[in-house]
A protein has these predicted regions:
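Active-site beta->alpha loop and helix N-cap motifs at the rims of alpha/beta catalytic domains
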Residues: 50, 76-145
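Hydrophobic faces of well-ordered beta-strands that scaffold small-molecule active sites
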Residues: 41-44, 62-64, 102-106, 134-136, ...
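Single conserved hydrophobic/aromatic residue that forms the stacking wall/gate
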Residues: 155-166
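Short, well-ordered coil/turn segments that N-cap beta-strands
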Residues: 37-40, 59-60, 98-102, 130-132, ...
Length: 166
């Protein structure tokens, strides 16, 4: 038993108990934390082992950054990182941190061409990568992409309840 583990009477460790009670933060909870100036813990991870440590440390959010192309895949820049590579890293992170809010970083070329591309690739992060949100860069020049993805999110969040009632 390591120094950081605390044994409970029935033999489980503190981490075993923590795994059972940890609940993934929702976007609403994260917004409330920000509004109330409560710290939000955030880490960048690209792999199962790192995500496992983040989950055990009760980190609020994990960013799966396109920098994983340099750190994990050996690229000289983030330019060559593909959607498939990002999805693979997101899946590994999700397996390691099933109860942590995961954000997928949309790589260069996955959203710049059209709103449709942005939505299609954002959906891949959500469906295939099992991410809770996506991140893209570009400020005002990508405002229409952000709006298209945001509109998708609103439909995605509100429709399942209606579908169950039909």
């Amino acid at each position: 038993m390591g120094n950081s583990e605390i044994r409970i009477q029935d033999g489980r460790t503190h981490f075993d108990v923590q795994k059972q009670v940890k609940k993934k933060k929702t976007i609403t909870e994260l917004r409330e934390m920000r509004r109330n100036a409560r710290p939000i813990t955030w880490i960048t991870a690209y792999s199962y082992p790192t995500a496992t440590v983040a989950e055990r440390a009760d980190i609020d959010m994990i960013l799966v950054g396109d920098s994983g192309g340099m750190v994990e895949l050996g690229y000289k820049s983030t330019n060559p990182v593909t959607m498939d590579e990002m999805i693979s890293m997101c899946k590994a992170v999700r397996r390691g941190a099933p109860k942590t809010f995961v954000v997928g970083d949309m790589p260069q070329g996955s959203y710049e061409i059209s709103d449709e591309d942005a939505v299609t690739n954002a959906l891949r992060f959500i469906k295939e990568g099992d991410c809770d949100a996506v991140k893209l860069e570009g400020g005002e020049r990508v405002a229409s992409r952000v709006k298209a993805i945001h509109n998708l999110s609103l439909i995605h969040i509100s429709e399942p309840t209606r579908l169950r009632r039909i």
